[in-house]
């Protein structure tokens, strides 16, 4: 059984991720998502123990629907919200919070089994995050005003990547020019952090390698943004995997589970095995 979205906040919206009103695992009423609700943790532990008694193995998810709120000590004002994608793979504070949750949920000793999840043979795998990627949604992800600092962070990282690869704007311009057409805009300069990434949708965006060279989705810009995304994915997953091993996790570790496109596939190669979401005949109530 996959223990999924245990980190979700209490929600009223139909079809939304939400936890038990009386006993959520994380006690968001304290103004942050960093502490367990005592009854919620007890229910979680009891459920794990009963599954184990029946010979049912456990798939442990880490971040799924975590509600990042101002009380978590975020880098920027306001609440980032629940189920956000991509930004928790870039932002240092969000990564720290993910590691904190991983340590607390995996190293806590279950009073019903006498074991922490890191030592329990009923656990067969730990998954780092749910349906996420550093290139998911590209530069147009989450247009809420309060998320602008997080979008800026991605753009700044991309520009730093371009400077590291090319050194100067002139060399970048040369690399992005084909048959007299340049994909780099006159106003774009990596030293000023103004080079835009690729526009796209929920998955890795598509690109025609023979398409128009000078547009935002040009093959040159696309290739560098995908290389950047692969690098960010692998850096994040390698770091998280090293941290989980330092806690004592012994089972195979999965990176994520909604991989679409060759760049995304390569960006998730650091998992011990692969997962991908496939939904069949799902009822929505």
Segments (PLM) and residue ranges:
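Active-site mouth of glycoside hydrolases
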Residues: 1-241, 246-252, 257-271
